């Protein structure tokens, strides 16, 4: 079955926290097999996210972080001195904000691309009633049930 990466990752995370003691043996086996099938997708996704963050936090990012610290210090001084910022100071802060807005946008695009990528997973469907038993025992919300509904018959 093909699913979006984020769907597989969310399902893996939800399955990991389930208390399966009240489920039938067949349903418990299905949960275990699904964990096995979804784990590599989840681990690869987490690794990819780390790599994206590391890639984005390059030398330019470090320089901009330093500029942020300097701008914060400037804002503190301006407040202490009870004065208005100069136009040059305002431009510096606007430039920093614009750079980080573009940086965040690029990061979000990469992360969305990773999350939306389709992956093939071999999952075992199980009865919805069994899923509800596990969720009751695990004190989970229906929002979390929804993340696993695609695994049920």
Can you say where each PLM-predicted feature lies in the sequence?
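A composition-driven surface/loop motif
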Residues: 1-153
């Amino acid at each position: 079955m093909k699913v979006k990466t984020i769907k597989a990752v969310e399902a893996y995370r939800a399955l990991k926290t389930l208390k399966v003691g009240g489920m039938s043996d067949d349903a418990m086996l299905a949960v275990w097999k699904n964990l096995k099938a979804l784990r590599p997708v989840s681990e690869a996704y987490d690794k990819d996210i780390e790599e994206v963050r590391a890639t984005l936090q390059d030398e330019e990012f470090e320089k901009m972080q330093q500029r942020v610290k300097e701008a914060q210090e400037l804002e503190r001084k301006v407040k202490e001195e009870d004065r208005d910022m100069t136009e040059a100071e305002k431009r510096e802060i606007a430039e920093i904000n614009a750079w980080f807005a573009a940086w965040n946008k690029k990061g979000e695009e990469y992360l969305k691309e990773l999350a939306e990528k389709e992956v093939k997973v071999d999952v075992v469907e199980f009865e919805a009633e069994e899923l509800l038993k596990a969720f009751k025992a695990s004190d989970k919300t229906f929002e979390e049930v929804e993340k696993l509904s695609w695994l049920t018959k």
